[in-house]
Amino acid sequence: MSKQLKITLKKSAIGRPSKQRDTLRGMGLSKINKAVVLKDCTEIRGMINKVSHLVSCEEVEGVE
C-alpha cells in the first residue's frame, strides 16, 4: 500500500498569478470543492506548497 494525498480546491483561482493557476491545472483542480487523489511524492508536495492557501490536503491510504 502506498500513501496518497486527497487535495481539495477551497478557494477560487480567479485573480491569482498564472503560475498558481497552472499549478492547480496541473494537479487536475478546476472548480471549487473538486477533489483529486494523487500519489504522495516530492513533486506533488512542491505543487501543494505553491498553492497551500487555495487548497486543503489530507493523507489517505491507497492501494495501487
UniProtKB/Swiss-Prot annotation:
Keywords, in A-Z order: Ribonucleoprotein, Ribosomal protein
InterPro entries per the UniProt record, alphabetical: Ribo_uL30_ferredoxin-like_sf, Ribosomal_uL30_bac-type, Ribosomal_uL30_ferredoxin-like
Domain of life assignment: Bacteria
Database matches in Gene3D superfamilies: Ribosomal protein L30, ferredoxin-like fold domain (3.30.1390.20)
Record keyword Ribosomal protein present: yes
GO biological process, one term: translation
GO molecular function list: structural constituent of ribosome
CDD domains for this protein: Ribosomal_L30
A cellular component term, taken from the record's GO annotations: cytosolic large ribosomal subunit
Record text on subunit structure and interactions: Part of the 50S ribosomal subunit.
Family membership noted in the UniProt record: Belongs to the universal ribosomal protein uL30 family.
Protein name per UniProt: Large ribosomal subunit protein uL30
Gene giving rise to this polypeptide: rpmD
